[in-house]
Amino acid sequence: MREEDTVCVGSDGLQYCKVCGEAKEAFFPEGGFMGMKKHFRQCACDRKAYEEEQKYFKDKEHRELVSRNTSICFDESRMEEWTFENADMSDAVMHKAKSYVDNWEEMKRNHIGCLFWGPVGTGKSYIAGCIANELLKREVTVKMTNFNTIIDNIFPLADKTEYINALASYQLLIIDDLGVERNSEYALGIIFSVIDRRIRSGRPLIITTNLPLKEIKSETMLDKRRIYDRILEMCTPVYVGGTSKREAIASMKMEKAKTLLNTNRGKEKCE
């Protein structure tokens, strides 16, 4: 639409918007300004268009930031689908995880982390991933990784301190599957350095592990003992029990496969 189709001149000589009726011009105070008597002003339509434009660019910037932080956060793209929207929110632990996110500012201020522990396959990593994805939406920087990856990444580096400091810089650090990494003196030294530096940074730490809490608390090996002591200093233990979700998924896939493989096969059956 042409500007002349939306603008008219009032009896006072000012231009008016035909849509909202507001003036698109205003008079300078008596005497004018540099020989000009009138200046431009935004009508309601102009203000609305400006606000919509600002919102568009702000939303675009937000989406790009979240996308960039998400790609940095996860080692595997499938983890991006681990969200509260896809979870069973009737689960008590999942509800606690959501509460952690909803109270993030207080958790961050008080340096409160979580230690999700329990049997294999009960969804500990998924729960941590849900926390990560929800905080990423809120423009919180998160890194979710494991010590095997950290040790592999740090091994060839001349400046290991820089890498460890980078891990400490994220607003939330999530270490997945504590206890499956190598038990060498070198590996345990790296693990302690990462945990210790993180705690000294004052930023929250979340850990998932299949190790029983009793075993963590009663560890006698000195190198592990000092690691676990530092973890329990910051992370509140949260038990994740129930049946193995991995076994349930595997069973469901097996039944689906049997159904598909037995389709139109006559008397041939999958056992």
Task: Annotate each language-model stretch with its function.
Residues 109-111, 170, 202:
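A general structural motif
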Residues 108-128:
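Walker A/P-loop nucleotide-binding motif
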Residues 94-101, 117, 132-172, 182-189:
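Short glycine-rich substrate-engagement loop in P-loop NTPases that contacts/grips substrate
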Residues 177-178:
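Walker B catalytic acidic pair
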Residues 1-94, 248-271:
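A short, basic N-terminal segment
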Residues 172-174, 206:
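Structural motif
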Residues 90-112:
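A short, well-structured juxtamembrane/interface segment
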